[in-house]
From Swiss-Prot:
Putative nuclear shuttle protein. InterPro entries: Nanovirus_C8. It comes from the Viruses. This is Putative nuclear shuttle protein. Keywords: Host cytoplasm, Host nucleus. It is found in: Host nucleus; Host cytoplasm. GO terms for cellular component: host cell cytoplasm; host cell nucleus. Pfam families: Nanovirus_C8. Belongs to the nanoviridae nuclear shuttle protein family. Its main location: host cell. The lineage of its organism: Viruses, Monodnaviria, Shotokuvirae, Cressdnaviricota, Arfiviricetes. The keyword Nucleus does not apply. It comes from Faba bean necrotic yellows virus (isolate Syrian SV292-88) (FBNYV).
Length: 153
C-alpha cells in the first residue's frame, strides 16, 4: 500500500435524505472516479475509505428511538455485504423534537484491476436504516458520504 501514497487523492460525495424513517428505508449510491477518457494510459484505483456523517430529528414525548445506519457495498462477486454500522437514536421526556448526529470512517483499501482509459471505476453502495425501536414517520435523517479514492497510472 505504500506505493499508493504518492498517487493523487480524489473524493466522491453523496447526500442521502430520508424525510421519514418508516419502513426500513434505503438508498443506492454509486462511487465513481469520473476519469473516463481523461488519462492517456490505463490506471488502477484504490478505494481508500468511506466516511459517513449524519444528523436527524424525531418528535414525541416519553419516547425512545433506536436504530442503525448500515452501509453496504456490492462486492466483485455481486453480493451486497455490510461494511459497517453507525448507531442512531435518542430519548425524549417531553413533547418536543429530539436530535441525533454521528460520524464514522470505514477503512476499505480495495484495489481495482487495471482499468482502460475509456472506462470509469464504479462501485455500488447501499445506505439502509435499520429500525430497532421506534423509528417511524416522525423521524428523519440526512446522511453525508465521502469516498476517498487514489488513482495510479
Amino acid at each position: 500500500m505504500a506505493d499508493w501514497f504518492s498517487s493523487p487523492l480524489k473524493t466522491c460525495t453523496h447526500v442521502c435524505d430520508f424525510p421519514s424513517l418508516a419502513g426500513d428505508p434505503q438508498q443506492e449510491i454509486m462511487c465513481c472516479d469520473s476519469m473516463k477518457n481523461k488519462l492517456q494510459d490505463s490506471r488502477k484505483v484504490l478505494l481508500v475509505s468511506c466516511s459517513v456523517s449524519f444528523n436527524g430529528s424525531f418528535y414525541g414525548g416519553n419516547r425512545n428511538v433506536r436504530g442503525q445506519l448500515q452501509i453496504s457495498m456490492v462486492e466483485d462477486d455481486g453480493v451486497c455485504r455490510p461494511i459497517g454500522y453507525v448507531p442512531i437514536g435518542g430519548y425524549l421526556y417531553h413533547n418536543d423534537y429530539g436530535y441525533y448526529e454521528g460520524t464514522r470512517t470505514f477503512n476499505l483499501d480495495l484495489e481495482s484491476q487495471y482499468l482502460k482509459k475509456d472506462e470509469d471505476y464504479n462501485r455500488k453502495f447501499l445506505v439502509s436504516i435499520l429500525n430497532e425501536n421506534g423509528l417511524d414517520s416522525q423521524c428523519d435523517l440526512k446522511v453525508f458520504i465521502v469516498h476517498s479514492i487514489r488513482i495510479k497510472v
